[in-house]
Amino acid sequence: MSSPRKVRGKTGRDNDEEEGNSGNLNLRNSLPSSSQKMTPTKPIFGNKMNSENVKPSHHLSFSDKYELVYPEPLESDTDETVWDVSDRSLRNRWNSMDSETAGPSKTVSPVLSGSSRLSKDTETSVSEKELTQLAQIRPLIFNSSARSAMRDCLNTLQKKEELDIIREFLELEQMTLPDDFNSGNTLQNRDKNRYRDILPYDSTRVPLGKNKDYINASYIRIVNHEEEYFYIATQGPLPETIEDFWQMVLENNCNVIAMITREIECGVIKCYSYWPISLKEPLEFEHFSVFLETFHVTQYFTVRVFQIVKKSTGKSQCVKHLQFTKWPDHGTPASADFFIKYVRYVRKSHITGPLLVHCSAGVGRTGVFICVDVVFSAIEKNYSFDIMNIVTQMRKQRCGMIQTKEQYQFCYEIVLEVLQNLLALY
């Protein structure tokens, strides 16, 4: 079920949120760690994790062109470094743009829309009423037996102490994982990584083109009750990898991109703005043109619709870009409500190819999204689910998925809220 300037990589292991520090942008050989504060470290390539295997957890069931800035680090709130964003091209870009823009995620009115050529295929408007309805996940079968089983599931979750959840996360941290990071560690690919220790496994990395070129992205397949949920988890594009990113979108026939970060958070650049911000001017690359067709800004996420045109053939593909803008600078959202609605809208929008998800490093918030999306699908189909098992599967396919204990706890909080809201209706 399917569901050109360079920056140095950093490490993301010890970060709480999704980004980290920076070093001297002119130090080509420096790959600072996200666990450090302001001082870059010596390059260390690779991230071998050896330990005991994770133990099974209780199975829960309720069922019988514009080069602007240098992007920044990973999913954590422990790193306080800021990239240099004083580039004149950045200032000139924003000073010269027309008023019809849908670029950086900034504070806006609750509803703002724009369009160059609105059609049924590119309509982006979404009402809060629709989102509220989407958040009310309803199982296929919800008779008295199913409701009773769901209450049992809810009770089991509610009885889990915070310490139990933390213990689960610590077990996940001790998993023995693959150690095949050869592609990401080659000299020609090191500058394509945002962090030196967040690399895709060779076995699950997303290859580009006939030559199987490198991008820091991983295929993630989660199996639950014989159903497979298919994703691409990737880091936020760097200036030098933007065209690679769009190539990946086209080659994998992805019709949805879920972006779970703002471009700048707490003064730190989290992700390079890789899309056109004007309805009148496309973003041009060597092989592709990206057009902004329409956009719609809600209180907590922005919808953009792009047409990506391959210059050699003239073929185009429509892609919906959904950017969640209410994840706080540090920690996790205080309320799960906005994120639940966002995840459900992303799932509703998905049609073809793997669902492409990214934050900054493509592991922390990205992991939370994938985990709860799988659980929501399980609830809809009256399937049992096991959060620890889902995260275990993710980590076997991309290192560090769900980076912090706070993010792991947030998954439980989200699921609890969904189940409580569902049972309250009956």
From Swiss-Prot:
Extent of Polar residues compositional bias: 95-117
Region Disordered: start-end pairs: 1-58, 95-124
Main subcellular location: nucleus
Compartments where located: Nucleus; Cytoplasm; Cytoplasm, Cytoskeleton, Microtubule organizing center, Centrosome
Modified residues (Phosphoserine): 76, 127
GO MF entry, a single one: protein tyrosine phosphatase activity
Substrates-to-products reaction catalysed: O-phospho-L-tyrosyl-[protein] + H2O = L-tyrosyl-[protein] + phosphate
Enzyme class: hydrolase
The entry's keywords: Cytoplasm, Cytoskeleton, Hydrolase, Microtubule, Nucleus, Phosphoprotein, Protein phosphatase
Residues bound to substrate: 329, 359-365, 403
Segments of skewed composition (Low complexity): 21-35
Identification of the protein by name: Tyrosine-protein phosphatase non-receptor type 20
